[in-house]
């Protein structure tokens, strides 16, 4: 195969070079440095540009370098690429070369690029799902790569490298008939005939120009369609990559009643996993996980024929970022209890709704109920453990805080397609306590949560206080408490959260479970790990559990020595295509939705009716900030209201345990719209409201 090194290109500052190089159509390859994460920084990768597709792979071993076939004309960019390739070829014969494995691909026809203004070696490639941060060894190498990108048909430069690459608009086309007129006069034709010929040419050109205009519009539509299809097809196109990265060699994983399963993220590094997730987003509009519909309406709801939304409303205003430092500076010396954080730091759901988000994978409890009915108690306990872990999956990438509910604020969720009804209420303001109750097919779930926070300068540690209870109709009960959550890089760096600690799931019959959420370190290549076991009443391990709280969970019978026979318990749903800065899951996007006919059934205390939260969801940021300040002034009266003898409407305290239990009656009151004893807590505050409460 003819390998040539890219010579020092006669490039201008903005990357121009000779036209022959751009139009040669040769494959381009070389070593680029790719930014991975803060722990590992810049890592060298082997990049190959061919047929409009940019692929990259690790280069630890010679077999990781793709040289295509001997007939391909490959142009290498950079001295380091040539030197390293020759050195690797001398160390390993061609016969040892194995099948090439990419760890990332980029379809350039639906991508764009931009060179860095601050560093002459850096440039960026933008796709619908990610941004590649790349760096070369020199200015000339960057110019060569940018020329190669520009020569790829259809790529759109964000900062034009050379004006010749843009598509010529039909209105800029023109035609000159001077040569034609001159030639006709030379043939002896008279002026009237020449003028007639000129008119014919102009007429034909106008028709051609109109056709070009139509083709131009069609081209734009096709490019838009390609960009939309890209997100839907990336996972299918990269399925081979997915298997290569995540499949444990020679392991065959089987899921519970779902056939063979060949993916296991526990073997992949955080870098590999991130690279794959960036290029393979799943285009799935379904928000629920129950694969089988219930045969009868066990929870008292009839399935309504409507489609829940798959995206948030388009913002009505352009959001303006907020500097945390400037906000701290502006509030130095002020009473912090009266400082109102702007809605920029909030996501458009409340903590009440976030409680319901933990039930996104409620089908696990349905499965647990069925397993228990058929005498498979171990599988019931395993599914309960998977459910306890699954509630953390939605926290990945969520950088905004939910709204703090007002005292007495409520939230209902009637999801007949999932077979569940959920209700929650803020039952105390000092301390803040949220109680919830949920009914499913053959099970009930309830609990209350109070967060104790500790500020450590660069991080905030949240320790949940409260017990969650799951009771099946046959009397089997499981109880557990949530683990500690720590939010890192509050002031500087990339904000992220981690969950860590021991979760003990206690059963009142044969099995209990213990899970350890491993705390993530700065250089951890395999974060979010969960490991544990299920034991019987004698203390003997019945099954071993392992996986990641943001991705999947597996189990192996016994002590877990033979992980090759592991079975899938739970797999997180892929991120939706219509992501916003809130990083909502498809399920989370439905939580604050006012479906047709729902508003007139809700009590005036429901979170969906909270004005600042609704304005934020609609992108009306100024109104949202105004309403948030108004409601927080009202919130400061909550202690006085609570101390005056206020009691929650739908929950009652259980003795000295400081826990709350649902008293019943909400759904019955909803059926007859009996909300006379529910004050309008979101309205204008008056002393009468306090007396009423």
From Swiss-Prot:
SUPFAM superfamilies: Oxysterol-binding protein-like, PH domain-like. PROSITE patterns: PH_DOMAIN. Residues 1-15 have a biased composition (Polar residues). Residues 1-22, 256-298, 600-639 are annotated as: Disordered. GO terms for molecular function: lipid binding. Keywords: Coiled coil, Lipid transport, Lipid-binding, Transport. GO terms for biological process: lipid transport. Residues 285-294, 600-635 have a biased composition (Basic and acidic residues). Expressed in roots, leaves, stems and flowers. Residues 25-154 form the PH domain. Residues 274-284 have a biased composition (Acidic residues). Residues 207-239, 612-643 form a coiled coil. May be involved in the transport of sterols. Belongs to the OSBP family. PANTHER family: OXYSTEROL-BINDING PROTEIN-RELATED, OXYSTEROL-BINDING PROTEIN-RELATED PROTEIN 2B. This is Oxysterol-binding protein-related protein 2B. The lineage of its organism: Eukaryota, Viridiplantae, Streptophyta, Embryophyta, Tracheophyta. The gene is ORP2B.
